[in-house]
């Protein structure tokens, strides 16, 4: 009973922005999708020329009233084998897709479907970011949703027994679209 009252009080304070929450986020997706660039932009508010991620990296970020421990796990085939090691106690997954590389949409869908089928992640909210919308050959949100099989996401609704999933289109280099995704995600943490 005491914990219920404390939890209710904490939720009220958090809704008013008076309680700091903490979450663990994983940045996943295929190589060259923009995971490291996004994390660098969130941390340093500037672009940089970055090398592919060969080893997992961790950063502490504050977005709004939430402090995140983030893990950039790399997207090359060897790195994907390590993803499962970071699933315990994860609060959210940010899955990036290069929206200007439709040749790799099938590969991204296979990885995303595999993640959706992991029991340990059944309640973990997923943000799918269609990155690089500034590129001339980037697909639309509807095309990306179709290619990834994400036609019925939860949007802003909380649906009992259904994992929160939403797609946002963004351009990390143009600083566009990703903050909305983190605002959406923060309501579930």
UniProtKB/Swiss-Prot annotation:
Record keywords: Cytoplasmic vesicle, Endoplasmic reticulum, ER-Golgi transport, Golgi apparatus, GTP-binding, Hydrolase, Membrane, Nucleotide-binding, Protein transport, Transport
Any GO MF annotation of the entry: GTPase activity
Leader sequence segment: none
Gene3D superfamilies named among the record's database cross-references: P-loop containing nucleotide triphosphate hydrolases
Catalytic reactions on record: GTP + H2O = GDP + phosphate + H(+)
Keyword Nucleotide-binding appears in the UniProt entry: yes
Membrane topology: Peripheral membrane protein
Binding-site residues for GTP, renumbered to this chain: 29-36, 72-75, 131-134
Family the entry assigns: Belongs to the small GTPase superfamily. SAR1 family.
Function recorded in the entry: Small GTPase component of the coat protein complex II (COPII) which promotes the formation of transport vesicles from the endoplasmic reticulum (ER). The coat has two main functions, the physical deformation of the endoplasmic reticulum membrane into vesicles and the selection of cargo molecules. SAR1 controls the coat assembly in a stepwise manner. Activated SAR1-GTP binds to membranes first and recruits the SEC23/24 complex. These SEC23/24-SAR1 prebudding intermediates are then collected by the SEC13/31 complex as subunits polymerize to form coated transport vesicles.
Designated name of the protein: Small COPII coat GTPase SAR1
Organism this protein belongs to: Candida glabrata (strain ATCC 2001 / BCRC 20586 / JCM 3761 / NBRC 0622 / NRRL Y-65 / CBS 138)
Lineage: Eukaryota, Fungi, Dikarya, Ascomycota, Saccharomycotina
């Amino acid at each position: 009973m005491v914990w219920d009252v404390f939890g209710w009080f904490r939720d009220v304070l958090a809704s008013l922005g008076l309680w700091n929450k903490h979450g663990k986020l994983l940045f996943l997706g295929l190589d060259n999708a923009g995971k490291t660039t996004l994390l660098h932009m969130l941390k340093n508010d500037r672009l940089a020329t970055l090398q592919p991620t060969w080893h997992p990296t961790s950063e502490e970020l504050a977005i709004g009233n939430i402090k995140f421990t983030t893990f950039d796990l790399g997207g090359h085939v060897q790195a994907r084998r390590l993803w499962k090691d970071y699933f315990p106690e994860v609060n959210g997954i940010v899955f990036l897709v290069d929206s200007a590389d439709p040749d790799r949409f099938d590969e991204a869908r296979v990885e995303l479907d595999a993640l959706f089928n992991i029991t340990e992640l059944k309640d973990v909210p997923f943000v799918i970011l269609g990155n690089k919308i500034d590129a001339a050959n980037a697909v639309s949100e509807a095309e990306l949703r179709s290619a990834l099989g994400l036609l019925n996401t939860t949007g802003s609704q909380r649906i009992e027994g259904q994992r929160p999933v939403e797609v946002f289109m963004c351009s990390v280099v143009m600083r566009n679209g990703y903050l909305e995704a983190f605002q959406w995600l923060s309501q579930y943490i």
